[in-house]
From Swiss-Prot:
Family statement drawn from the similarity comment of this UniProt entry: Belongs to the conotoxin O1 superfamily.
Keywords: Cleavage on pair of basic residues, Disulfide bond, Knottin, Neurotoxin, Secreted, Signal, Toxin
Cellular component, GO, one term: extracellular region
Organism: Conus ventricosus
Annotated disulfide bonds: 59-74, 66-78, 73-82
Domain notes from UniProt: The presence of a 'disulfide through disulfide knot' structurally defines this protein as a knottin. The cysteine framework is VI/VII (C-C-CC-C-C).
Subcellular location field: Secreted
The protein, known as: Conotoxin VnMKLT1-022
InterPro entries in alphabetical order: Conotoxin
Molecular function in Gene Ontology: ion channel inhibitor activity; toxin activity
Residues that make up the propeptide removed upon maturation: 23-55
Amino acid sequence: MKLMCMMIVAVLFLTAWTFVTADDSINGPENRRIWEKLLSKTRDEMKNPEASKLNKKECRQPGEFCFPVVAKCCGGTCLVICI
C-alpha cells in the first residue's frame, strides 16, 4: 500500500513538472517577446510612478467647461465653467 501511494505521488509530481517546464508552442517565441516587453514596461512604471500615463491627471483651464464632481480646475473652483 505504501509503495502504491509513493508511486501515485511520484507520477503526479512528474506530470506537474512536465507541465511546468513544457515549452508553450502555441504562443511561440514572438508572443513571448511581446509579453516580456509589456512586463518590463510595467516594472519600469512601478519603479518610477511618474513614467505612468495613468497618474497624470489634467486640470481644466479657467473658462473651460467642467463638471463639479468629476473635473478639476487648475484654479480650484468649478461651477460648470472653471473660474
